[in-house]
Regions:
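Enzymes that bind and transform nitrogen-containing heteroaromatic metabolites
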Residues: 1-185
Length: 185
């Protein structure tokens, strides 16, 4: 039986937000460069399936479907697991829609004999749901050096402290800091 790792990959502001109050995230893009692109490409290539909520799927689909290059290839060709109670059809594929019990469905994805990780692309609400349930095995967080003052955090309202160990970090030329963290168990 397989036990694939669930990795939550997100970019966050210095003050801990993944999106602005209106749900936008354009403030993060100026901090991306060749070195951070390589970091991201590696995680995408290791993925066996991209997991995301409906909003992320609807935002990412048109962008990546119209893009080219190694990152676009990794995003477009690998299967997507879309978690939604309202999405009826997933056109950016290959994709499978999950709308039931989150804990059971993540366990199903982890147990599949497919290769690679379950790479979760936030939104903050989906990320928060996974984190609250203790379903994330590894966090790959890139913090960009900008404070946005308010927004949506994947770590808001967890109910208890989430203690993490930093197992790797890399600083990019732009000043962004990527960290791999695992929950203390």
């Amino acid at each position: 039986m397989s036990d694939r790792k669930v990795i939550l990959k997100m970019v966050m502001s210095l003050d801990g937000f993944a999106t602005s109050p209106d749900g936008t995230h354009e403030w993060m893009f100026e901090w991306f460069g060749d070195d951070s692109g390589e970091w991201n490409r590696h995680a995408l290539e290791e993925a066996g399936v991209h997991a995301m909520g409906r909003r992320s799927y609807e935002i990412m689909g048109p962008h990546w479907a119209a893009s080219e290059g190694p990152i676009a290839t990794a995003m477009n060709e690998k299967p997507k697991a879309v978690f939604s109670h309202t999405l009826e059809k997933a056109e950016w594929g290959p994709a499978e829609i999950f709308g039931g019990d989150l804990r059971a469905e993540i366990a199903d994805l982890k147990a599949r004999e497919d290769e690679g990780t379950v790479l979760v692309h936030g939104g903050p609400d989906f990320a928060k749901s996974l984190t609250r349930l203790g379903l994330v095995d590894e966090f790959q967080l890139t913090t960009v050096p900008v404070a946005i003052g308010a927004g949506h955090s994947p770590f808001a309202e967890l109910g208890e402290h989430l203690k993490l160990d930093v197992v790797e970090e890399e600083r990019f030329r732009s000043g962004a800091l990527a960290q791999i963290l695992v929950p203390k168990r």
